[in-house]
Amino acid sequence: MSNENNAIHGFDVNLICDFFLNTERQGPGSPEVTLKALSFIDNLTDESLIADLGCGTGGQTMTLARHAPGRITGLDFFPGFIDRFNADARRLHLADRVKGVVGSMDALPFRAGELDLIWSEGAIYNIGFERGLNEWREYLKPGGYLAVSESVWFTDERPTEIHDFWVDAYPEIDTIPNKVAQIHRAGYLPVAAFVLPETCWTEHYFAPLAKARELFAAKYPGDSTAEGLMAFQRYEEELYRKYSEFYGYVFFIARKPNPRWTPCPGATPNSGATPSSGATPSSGAT
């Protein structure tokens, strides 16, 4: 594929959403990874309020709902995603406490201090990692959790081809230590961070895209823009297979401080489970 249109933002957003409408996931992840991230979160009850921001069609949301108490609101700007989200919630008999709404990440339909947990898998980049951290914090209760997966560099140096691709697609991509520092600056306490395994890309993201491309090609025969989008998806997969040692996704779990907490003796603002500056893909989930 030519590098002339090698960023996803070069395509019409409605066409992108239409492509992903027939996929359970719109980015790397897996049920196992969702549950691993959930394992770091305490104190959820039947009264807890959870928001999944940029929920897409809701694959990860349904996993959350089957394993966590509370009421969950999935939010996405694309109505087609929300239609499928709510249909799946009904099919899985979860609609009494799981609902999808059409909305924007930069105008959340929640009150300040209302949420016990904000979840976002592979979607915070739409608003920007730092902006999302700072703007979403006010919606969390004191002691509430934030759990997001985000694209990161695993190394300080990388080949020009993959560096240029990602800097064009998402200028905020950065190393794990720098992301953790951003979490601190936004006023959270880091709880955990782990790298998503390669199967989250190969088996749970790229493999289902083959079927999605078949359906998409049948819907848009001879459409050059649709063909370009499918070529982009194949190029993205090619890049990952060539350069997966240099980048990937990390799940970050953090907590909004509660003023009522009593600090433990010797505690510092940097306490908590955070990856070291030498974190590598091998530190990820298994």
PLM feature segments, named:
Residues S151-Y170:
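Short, glycine-/aromatic-enriched active-site segment of Class I SAM-dependent methyltransferases
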Residues R131-Y145:
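A short glycine-rich, Lys/Arg-flanked "PGG" loop and its adjoining helix->strand segment in the class I
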Residues E172-G187:
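Short alpha-helix
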Residues L117-E130:
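A short SAM/SAH-binding and catalytic strip from SAM-dependent methyltransferases
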Residues A192-C264:
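Conserved Class I S-adenosyl-L-methionine
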Residues G27-D46:
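Conserved alpha-helix/loop element of class I SAM-dependent methyltransferases that forms part
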Residues A51-L53, T57-A107:
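Class I SAM-dependent methyltransferase SAM/SAH-binding core
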Residues D106-L117:
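A short acidic, Gly/Pro-enriched loop at the edge of an enzyme's catalytic core
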